[in-house]
Structure formats: C-alpha cells, structure tokens
Design a protein with these regions (language model features):
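Short beta->alpha connector loops
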Residues: 54-57, 113-114
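Glycine-rich phosphate-binding P-loop
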Residues: 1
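Flexible beta-alpha connector loops of hexameric P-loop NTPases
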Residues: 20-31, 79-88
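Conserved nucleotide-sensing/catalytic segment adjacent to the nucleotide-binding pocket
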Residues: 23-54
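Acidic, Mg2+-coordinating active-site environments of NTP-dependent enzymes
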Residues: 44-47, 68-195
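Short hydrophobic/charged patches on amphipathic alpha-helices used for structural packing
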Residues: 35-39, 60, 95
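Short beta-strand-centered segment that lines the nucleotide-binding/catalytic pocket of NTP-utilizing
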Residues: 4-20, 53-54
Length: 195
C-alpha cells in the first residue's frame, strides 16, 4: 500500500482483489479457481498477486499454467505426511514451487532453515537469503517482544530500519523479511516497505 501498488492475496485465511476480501481457504486451490481469482485481480487493477501455496496444492500441480516472478521458501518441515506419504515426497512437493519461477524469477530462501539452505547451490535463478540467526542478504535482529507486540530491526546491505508489529513470533519475522526482500527486488525503498 505504502508503495502505491494494489496487491491481490490468496492465502489460507482470505482472498482479496485489492480491496474486496472474502474468507476462502487455499486447501482446495485448483487451476480453474486460481485462474478466476487472478483474472479478478487483474480486472481490479492489481499490479501484484501474493499466493500462499500449500505443499498439497504443489503436489497436485495446482499452479499449472502459472509462472512466478518470485518464489519464497520460508521453511521445509515435516507437514502433511499423511497426504505425502514420506518426508522425501513432501520435500519434492515444496521444491516444485521453484520450478514455477520464470527464467528471470527470484528465489527467496530462509538461510536459517537447514532444509532450504542446502538449495542455494542448486538454484539457477537469482537468490536472496533472509535470516535471523544465520548470515543472510536480509536479516532481522529481535529487540523486544511483549504480549501485544514485537520490535525488531531489519538490515539489508547498509540500510537498517526498526519494525514494530502486533503479530508475535519468529515465523512472522521471517514473513516480514521475505516481504522486505520482494519489495527491495521491486525497487521499493526499505522505509516504504517498513510502513
């Protein structure tokens, strides 16, 4: 918003075409439904679309026909093993996200997650790393955490900026780092991203 761009969202919590929001989970993500949502976003003049893609949707190839400008791998955990059958199948499903990148696409990888960190030498696209504990292109240093908010400093190169958020936890910090990486890749100033 602060950058003057309209962004559509498809997540496990909501779907929005910029301003119109509905509660629709992504568990049943399928190519026709996704095409309909992306068309609605285009008609609503969204310049960007953020799509949360669960491993089950990746295994079912629900991004068929979609090429991504940016793919973010925040972590690879042992989730949905009842569906995938094994950790290896789960990891293969998650890695399909990188296969959806355009030739000029950007991969954003969590340097703190050992199961995503090993990918760095295997990705044939530009990569930005994010992290709290390990060395990364974009880092966060937690400063304070209380019951109602947390504060941390995001550093990208020589630029640092404090961020305060009412959503608590490291996972949210990783999400903020990933969003910062996307914004910087689009040429948005870090001060604008922090808003």
């Amino acid at each position: 918003k602060a950058a003057g761009q309209t962004t559509g969202l498809i997540s496990s919590i909501e779907v929005s075409q910029g301003k119109n929001k509905t509660s629709v989970p992504t568990a049943d993500l399928n190519p026709p439904w996704l095409a309909e949502q992306l068309t609605s976003m285009a008609l609503a003049h969204c310049e960007n679309a953020v799509i949360e893609v669960p491993s089950i949707a990746l295994a079912r190839r629900c991004l068929a026909g979609v090429e991504l400008d940016v793919a973010i791998l925040t972590n690879i955990r042992e989730n949905h093993l009842d569906f995938h059958g094994s950790e290896a199948n789960y990891q293969r499903a998650k890695l399909r996200l990188l296969d959806k990148l355009k030739p000029t696409g950007l991969a954003i990888i969590n340097a703190d997650d050992p199961k995503t960190h090993f990918l760095l030498n295997q990705i044939d696209r530009p990569v930005l790393t994010v992290g709290i504990k390990q060395e990364a292109d974009i880092t966060a240093k937690p400063i304070d955490c209380s019951a109602g908010e947390q504060t941390f400093v995001i550093t990208a190169g020589s630029d640092s900026i404090p961020v305060r958020t009412t959503i608590i936890g490291d996972q949210h910090i990783y999400n903020c780092l990933a969003a910062t990486a996307v914004g910087l890749a689009q040429g948005i100033e870090i001060e604008t991203i922090a808003k």
